[in-house]
Amino acid sequence: TYENGKAVINQDICKGCGRCIGACAFDAIENQNWNANEILGRKMAEYSQAVCDGRPTFHISLVRDISPNCDCHGENDAPILPDVGIFASFDPVALDQACVDACLHATPMPNSQLSDNLADPHWHHHHDNFLDSNPNVRWKETLEHAEKIGLGTREYELIQMK
């Protein structure tokens, strides 16, 4: 909606999808709720649960061109990590956890936002490639919530194929 000639989020009808924030290339729209990223992550898990509930599903993740911001950001920077691989699972939560774990063990790409942050002596190191690239990322809370609501489990067995 509009107030005083500016676009604002109407919290009464907002579904929490974050699409408006991601679509704005100028960061002109921001949620006034400091927990917005955590709420968005929970909503993504809940929407995934609604789609998958009671249906047989199989999930594939191509872990490549890992950008510092959400893929929906039009102004994204160069990849922060090298291509990690292709992952597949019947369990979407286990799949995402396996992908995250692989990314956490990957070496940052040179001259990326992540490597620049890590080289900055004033940067607070999180020892997490995603948080060290963007401290607003809430991947852990999203996966914890997904597991809590029964979407899947964060436990997995990694079988490597060559």
Task: Label every PLM stretch briefly.
Residues T1-K162:
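Extended, low-polarity segments enriched in aliphatic/aromatic residues
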